[in-house]
Amino acid sequence: MLPELGFFLLLLATASAFFLALVPQFGLFKKNPTLINAAWPLSYIFTLATTLSIGLLAYSFAVDDFTLEYVAAHSNSQLPTFFKVAATWGGHEGSMLFWLFSLSLWLAAFAFFNRKNDRTFSAQSLSLLGLICFGFAVFILFYSNPFGRIFPAPAEGRDLNPMLQDVGLIFHPPLLYVGYVGFAVNFAMSLSALIYNQSARQIARSMRGWVLVSWLFLTIGIVLGAWWAYYELGWGGWWFWDPVENASLMPWLLGLALLHSLMATEKQGVFSYWTTLFSLLAFAFSVLGTFIVRSGALTSVHAFALDNTRGYVLLLIFFVLTALAFGLFALRAGSSSESAVKFQFISKSGGILLLNILLTIATVSTFLGTFYPMLFQAMNWGSISVGSPYFNSIFFPIITAILILMVIVLSIRKGQFDRTLLIRCGWLLIPSLILAGLMIWQQLRNNSALHFHAFAFVLLTLAIWLLFVTLWQNWRQIRLSQFGMILAHCGVAIVTIGAVMSGYFGSEIGVRLAPQQSQTLGQYEFHYRQFSNEIGPNFTAEVAFFDVTKNGKPYAEIIPERRYYDVRTMTMSEVGLDGGFWGDLYIVMGDSLGKGEFTFRLHYKPLIRWLWAGGILMAFGALFSVFGLRRKQEK
């Protein structure tokens, strides 16, 4: 009975979204305040119905209701409870319902925080959000219904994909979804501004907070996903340029460009067209990312639920939204009432312009690298893969230029270069070069198999330089309004340092070891002490115990595993990891060779944790910027 109630609530949500899309529009056309104001209760009804619907689905997982086909396909009675709840969004149907639930939260938040603002503009935006909600609700009802019954019900479920049975995957997809769909708010606001022929400057400040929060969630989601890929997939890396990874990167890059463009638009009235364009593109690429994950058109280690028909419906939604949005943008672009604003190239705004160009190039390059294989195959030209060499060759000069640009912009005051600041920034380059050289030399000294990389040295030097200049420029007087920017820019530098050191100067070796055998990697010796078999809640495990010494002194115990999941008949490696400030030791357990002998891959990843720290620092930068913006609005 409860699943039927969940389906009824989904129907109610669809109906409320339909009326939200139509009633305020009719009220705006007739200038009827009652119909205009109906946007608010309809928004809350949609949110309540969606929340209760996904809550009932989660409850069905918790109580092992295998009469639901979706629950039977993605859960098992032996699965720990918190993984049962996480399985709610572990497959296609549940993840789309969670997508809609996330959208409903943004809808309710926008309605609540704009209940006292311009009712006409807010109602128009809510109506457009209602249209988006209606489109996805209909898609779920007809193509992705998670409440379908199965008779006779199986005695046991198929279990959750073992790759998803991880704490990181409980939070990673929801954070990404919240970040993705948050861009729907600025999408609706920009369309409303186009409908009323307003410039982006008129809504820039109110829009910036929504973009900051969306970008904040997307940043945390990407960082958490990279961390999960690092310790769960067992290949020693953290970013594979996988299509699904790229699907989250593209709206992240566009959101970053939008944030900077909004600042220039708000303060100086420049880049209004850029701001509107980035606002529309950020959400459009979020929908495109959903297509990538769910269509099966692109092969991905993340695309666990594949269905071409569903994917093509999502692609249709993408084309309809983009056609309407950019058609309106094209119509209004030439008729905007915005007056011309004097623009100085040597200024903060000039730096933002160059940054936006670089971020646009990065997004377009990522898009081409992601979709070119699909186009190649669609044209019957065969199959082709685009991997890390392509993306690295594109992103190295872009990141280099961005790091240099960030330092140069810090030397601009009142529309011109400050000679004193330039000289001092130049002096800080010297210790940056020395420190970068020492960091690389230390790794080369510890492992003679490593080689010097000029590209890595350049990036490392620039990242350290940016960190030094940012801290030096602001250490005497840190204003709350700029504290978020300082944190975010320091985060960029720290992420770059972690990526360069772990990517270029990490060590790894593949070996076969039996108990009581050892292997040396750099200054570490890995001693395989013993082997045991263990039983988990829904798996059996082969466990190896390693004692690690550093320069002859006891350092750590590391315990990798190989788990066999009986229901799914899948074997997964659980990485053994010892992490620290200066680097991680990382063991991946491979195939069994009998009598406790296995193949292993041993890794040392210097400064890998700086990646996660830098990403979290960027997220905190966005959070403090939200607080700073809120204080300004209260004044």
Curated annotation (Swiss-Prot):
Give me the segments passing through the membrane: 6-26, 38-58, 93-113, 128-148, 167-187, 209-229, 239-259, 273-293, 311-331, 351-371, 390-410, 421-441, 452-472, 483-503, 570-590, 607-627
Q: Which GO terms describe its cellular component?
A: plasma membrane
Localization: Cell inner membrane
Q: Which domain of life is it from?
A: Bacteria
Pfam families on file: CcmF_C (PF16327), Cytochrom_C_asm (PF01578)
Keywords in UniProt for this one? Cell inner membrane, Cell membrane, Cytochrome c-type biogenesis, Membrane, Transmembrane, Transmembrane helix
Example GO biological process term? Answer: cytochrome complex assembly
| Membrane topology value | Multi-pass membrane protein
GO MF entries: heme binding; heme transmembrane transporter activity
Protein family per UniProt:
Belongs to the CcmF/CycK/Ccl1/NrfE/CcsA family.
Listed PANTHER family: CYTOCHROME C ASSEMBLY PROTEIN-RELATED, CYTOCHROME C-TYPE BIOGENESIS PROTEIN CCMF
Which function does this protein serve?
Required for the biogenesis of c-type cytochromes. Possible subunit of a heme lyase.
Query: Could you tell me what this protein is called?
Result: Cytochrome c-type biogenesis protein NrfE
